[in-house]
Amino acid sequence: MSSYSELSNLPIREIPGDYGFPIISAIKDRYDYFYNQGEDAWFHNKAEKYKSTVVKINMAPGPFTSNDYKLVAFLDANSFVCMFDNSLIDKTDTLGGTFKPGKEYYSGYRPVAFIDTKDPNHAALKGYILSAFAKRHNLFIPLFRNSLSDHLFNNLEKQVTEQGKSDFNALLPTMTFNFIFRLLCDQTNPSDTVLGAQGPEHLRKWLFPQLIPSLSAKKLPNIIEDTLFHNFLIPFGFIKSDYNKLVDAFSKSAVSILDEAEKLGIKREEAVQNILFLVGINMFAGLNAFSPHLFRFVGEAGASLHTQLAKEIRTVIKEEGGAITLSAINKMSLVKSVVYETLRLRPPVPLQYGKAKKDFMVQSHDASYKINKGQFVVGYQPMASRDPKIFANPDEFVPDRFMNDGEKMLKHVLWSNGRETENPAPDNKQCPGKDLVHLLGRLILVEFFMRYDTFTVEITPLFRAPNVAFKTLTKASK
């Protein structure tokens, strides 16, 4: 478990910032956050305005979705890592930020991500998930490769050839859902269940009310979107039928993994809810947010990087007798660095929330600040992992940043709710899919550059993940 040292010779400073007028200032901050400035600029502007990386903020969505939106934000690498210390930060019902989905989204249960490590159920549930992954590790590569071929690359190439462009983001959900479902459901095809071909759509509908209060879909006029999605929580009834189909499909198909839960003393119904959360938030939403950034950065880097990646990948695979194995993938240092760099620049979950369990002192690079017991706090990870006092050229995509001596900087890669040099365990809050996400990020590059030499993309910025359209694909030279 990460522990945070409060010992410091830095000067003690009052936390700067101003919550402003009740409700009015919070609504203005919300419009700036979602529409006028955007997330990155909003946090940077707060730090610049108050000349501090520990500041008071009104955190979106604010009124009237939440009554508890007056937070303290940690915007540098030093202060941010206190969020990982279980003795200081309580994570109970703070996963989604200042609001929480109703228990009806999980049949009255609270998945492990919503409970703190002090909860007596935490260790059992987290241990169960980690064990389930470990027992299926031999399936990761073959199942993901099949999904990439059947549901992504073949369609990508066909659309580029026939239409001159292919929407990468539109193809991702079917690929990721197929992989996840088969992995956790004894290799059952989701199309053979009550979900049919609509599994990704049912999952997206179930996720939408849980995520949209903290996001901007950019598909409606600002005032309409804000009124509908940031002032009120969407009633569960709108997506109840989608949820019921998901529960039915996983209850009937994930037989082995549910049997494992019962052997550990976990109720089958509770295990289903934890699996559904794992599928929806940890894996489906995470992979669909991360993958566009990966191909955006690699695509914009151009043919030189593509040539280097293709050479490394094909050389290692040839040396391994033509087999794509975990051992082979682990030898690809540039591929590994590219994935780490993407996770550093654009973590799938950019915000970490919690409440102080006790009074403590938090340090930025320049000062110490007192955090009072019960204070709601948030860390904005893209600023922490792009801290200019930690990384050179922090806002640039540097493909080989984590190669050779650069590996020592991995402790500052924080995307998984923990340091990259640490591991998820039953007694911490680090993402249980940490190693799987990194493996899949590498594997998608390996599969891609075994097929293609280079490519070009068209990028459309969205609130967090960009939309990536492939414009050209050059097949691998013999």
UniProtKB/Swiss-Prot annotation:
Keywords: Heme, Iron, Lyase, Metal-binding
Induction and repression of expression: Up-regulated 6 and 12 hours-post-infection after infiltration with P.syringae pv. maculicola and between 2 and 4 dpi after infection by P.infestans.
Entry keyword annotation includes DNA-binding: no
Broad enzyme group: lyase
SUPFAM superfamilies: Cytochrome P450 (SSF48264)
Binding site for heme: C431
EC number assigned by the record: 4.2.1.121
Gene3D superfamilies, A to Z: Cytochrome P450 (1.10.630.10)
S-S bonds: none
PANTHER family: 9-DIVINYL ETHER SYNTHASE, CYTOCHROME P450 26
Function: Involved in the biosynthesis of the anti-fungal and antibacterial toxins colneleate and colnelenate. Can use (9S)-hydroperoxy-(10E,12Z)-octadecadienoate (9-HPOD) and (9S)-hydroperoxy-(10E,12Z,15Z)-octadecatrienoate (9-HPOT) as substrates but has no activity with the corresponding 13-hydroperoxides (13-HPOD and 13-HPOT).
Protein name: Divinyl ether synthase CYP74D2
UniProt source species: Solanum tuberosum (Potato)
